A protein has these predicted regions:
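N-acyltransferase acceptor-side catalytic subdomain
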Residues: 1-109
Length: 110
């Protein structure tokens, strides 16, 4: 179990293919997870479908990067059951402040 998660350790874990989890929001204990399957978004070969392009042009949504990292993280953690506890949240915020974690923020309307 990991007691203190700092940004360097978090980056090292991600680079090694593992990530931290907690059993609940209320615990301070962490463990590392090495998933058998991983999701990869191949951005080099990304194709924008006509329907998605139309939705983007509609102006209904606005997309920004790193404008609301803390709120995005809090939203991800704000669930009845979550794997994001306070130590993970703090480490992610520190990593973001150091330039190593980013958010894609999607806003509906103004």
């Amino acid at each position: 179990m990991v007691k203190r998660l700092d940004p360097r350790l978090l980056l090292h874990g991600y680079a090694s293919g593992v990530f931290p989890m907690a059993d609940s929001r209320d615990t301070d204990e962490l463990f590392w997870v090495e998933p058998r399957k991983r999701a990869i978004l191949p951005l080099q070969g990304f194709h924008l479908s006509r329907s998605l392009a139309k939705r983007i042009r509609s102006g209904r949504f606005r997309v920004t990067a790193d404008q609301a990292f803390e709120q995005v993280l809090a939203g991800c953690a704000d669930r009845e059951e979550t794997w994001i506890n306070r130590p993970i949240e703090q480490a992610m915020l520190e990593l973001h402040r150091a330039g190593g974690a980013h958010s894609v923020d999607v806003w509906e309307g103004e």
